[in-house]
Amino acid sequence: MKMKAYAKINIALDAIGKREDNYHLLRMIMQTVDLYDVIDIEKSNDSNISISCNKHYVPTDERNLAYKAAVLFRDEFNIKDGVKINIKKNIPVAAGMAGGSTNAAAVLVIMNKLFNVNASLEVLKEIGLKIGADVPYCIEGGTALCEGIGEIITPLKPFENKILVVLKPNFGVSTKEVYTNLDINKIRKHVNIEGLIQAMENDDLDYVSKNMKNVLENVTLKKHTILKNIKEDMRKSGALGAMMSGSGPTVFAFFDDMLTAQRAFEFLKGKYKYSDVYITRTINSNNL
């Protein structure tokens, strides 16, 4: 059984506090984009969970979130059968686009169908939260306000068909490290989430592009100053606005029209030769 597992961007990311377990309390606007991995799962003749992937640098053992998802799903529903999971990877790794989380989400959804468990999406989200904070959102997809550590999800009016260029530099970032180095007391200006939601409901891409904000830039951009240059180059190439997604290092920019986006894509691909550059669009849902 095969399924597309879509990437996400953060149109807003704010940190407003900390839980006792040191997890940050967040307010985020999440958005699915039309960039995806393909997850293919079949039952195996033994009780093993095996993973294969078209990218050699992706772990195929218990470090992979897809593996963790399969283990948790089997444990939850007392399933003894093994599964073979194939991941066709297109979403960049360690990029702030929930590549691992969306794979885990797809595994839960596929196994739910494959084994005729018929668990509700809410139950799948509860399992997903044990894997990672982004997994519940990846099960739901679309345009959403995510709060708590990301598990409290409020669907928003779809903000679809917006053109964007996405650039993932040739290095990864540790999400854990970024959050460890984030000092909430030093956040001078919090994100106007309500203003952004209103603008998105009004389909005002210009306002959204100029007012989107990610407080994690305070950490990642200090360590990787090249990201400032990428944002500036995107703006100079005609972007309405540019921002880092998640903990980074991926930077994305919204564009008014495909021609300007195409020119920016060519320029960025030429200048940042060892980076992954994509043109994509926002989409309504991940169709999970």
Curated annotation (Swiss-Prot):
Task: Name the catalytic site residues.
Answer: K8, D134
User: What InterPro entries does this protein map onto?
Assistant: GHMP_kinase_C_dom, GHMP_kinase_C_sf, GHMP_kinase_N_dom, IspE, Ribosomal_Su5_D2-typ_SF, Ribsml_uS5_D2-typ_fold_subgr
Q: What Enzyme Commission number(s) appear in the record?
A: 2.7.1.148
Tell me the pathway: Isoprenoid biosynthesis; isopentenyl diphosphate biosynthesis via DXP pathway; isopentenyl diphosphate from 1-deoxy-D-xylulose 5-phosphate: step 3/6
- Gene Ontology molecular functions: 4-(cytidine 5'-diphospho)-2-C-methyl-D-erythritol kinase activity; ATP binding
Q: Which residue spans adopt a coiled-coil conformation according to this UniProt entry?
A: none
Give the UniProt record's GO annotations in the biological process aspect: isopentenyl diphosphate biosynthetic process, methylerythritol 4-phosphate pathway; terpenoid biosynthetic process
Catalysed reactions, as listed in the record: 4-CDP-2-C-methyl-D-erythritol + ATP = 4-CDP-2-C-methyl-D-erythritol 2-phosphate + ADP + H(+)
Chain residues that bind ATP: P92, V93, A94, A95, G96, M97, A98, G99, G100, S101, T102
Q: Name one Pfam family in it.
A: GHMP_kinases_C
Q: Which UniProt keywords apply?
A: ATP-binding, Isoprene biosynthesis, Kinase, Nucleotide-binding, Transferase
The protein's matches in HAMAP family, at most eight in alphabetical order, are given as: IspE
Task performed by this protein: Catalyzes the phosphorylation of the position 2 hydroxy group of 4-diphosphocytidyl-2C-methyl-D-erythritol.
The UniProt similarity line reads: Belongs to the GHMP kinase family. IspE subfamily.
Q: What is this protein called?
A: 4-diphosphocytidyl-2-C-methyl-D-erythritol kinase
Q: Which organism is it from?
A: Clostridium perfringens (strain ATCC 13124 / DSM 756 / JCM 1290 / NCIMB 6125 / NCTC 8237 / Type A)
Q: What is the lineage of its organism?
A: Bacteria, Bacillati, Bacillota, Clostridia, Eubacteriales
Gene name tied to this protein: ispE
